[in-house]
Amino acid sequence: MSVGGKKMSRIEQEIHGIIDSLISDYDKDRPIDKMNNLGNQPDKEKITDIIDKLFKIMYPGYFRDRSHKVYDMRNYTTMLIEDVMYRLNQQIKTALRFSPENKEKEDTFFEDEAERLSVAFFKKIPEIRAYLNTDLQAAFDGDPAAYYKDEIILAYPGFYAITVNRIAHELFVLGVPMIPRIMTEHAHSLTGIDIHPGAIIGKYFFIDHGTGIVIGETTEIGEHVKIYQGVTCLLYTSDAA
């Protein structure tokens, strides 16, 4: 076999055969075959960056950029909020456009709804921080190996997963599509703790160790609850029961 007058080696022929087979497979019009998704879907890397910046807002004394000193907390917070709100707004807008139920909506809907949801989320941040403060206290009280609250914020995977979930839960409740799941699955990949953003979790929540914990969407957890590694809290389907 030759291409452009040049004889192909055996491995080149095999590669061309594989390519032909794959191109044919792409034409089957299945969900996994979509070609027009790039640029139209939420960006996981950008959402991860939003999480990192939200940690700077939730815990201003722990995750700030150390390359410069903050002389005016109000100015610093203003710049950070404006930056994160813009980035979140863009990702929410993309997620709304990507959702099948919105395919008939006008462009103005996506602009207005993304702005409304972004503002609504940021207004909830003081409430989220109030919950996180109780979670921090629960971890400190519940773990005799925790000598300082600082180490819980900086080092505990369970506290990281809880923080991400508190953020994602508010977005989920507001009706933001996809982004809450991307956030919690990012935390899951880092910590081994899988919390669905739809789960309802009360104050003073502590995850000890944490690896292998699964908390499903329908789960409701009250206040002052401590969960150890390897625990599953979810509703099984009748087929799985």
Language model features by range: what are they?
Residues 1-182:
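Terminal amphipathic alpha-helical/low-complexity segments used for targeting or macromolecular assembly
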Residues 154-156, 197, 235:
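Generic structural "secondary-structure junction" signal
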Residues 158, 174, 178, 196, ...:
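A short glycine-/small-residue-rich loop at the edge of a beta-strand within enzyme catalytic domains
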Residues 167, 185, 232-234:
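Double-stranded beta-helix
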Residues 177-180, 184-193:
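Membrane-interfacial amphipathic helices and adjacent loop/beta segments
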Residues 187, 193, 199-207, 211-213, ...:
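A structural motif detector for beta-strand N-caps
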Residues 236-241:
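Conserved small/polar residues in nucleotide/adenosyl-binding loops
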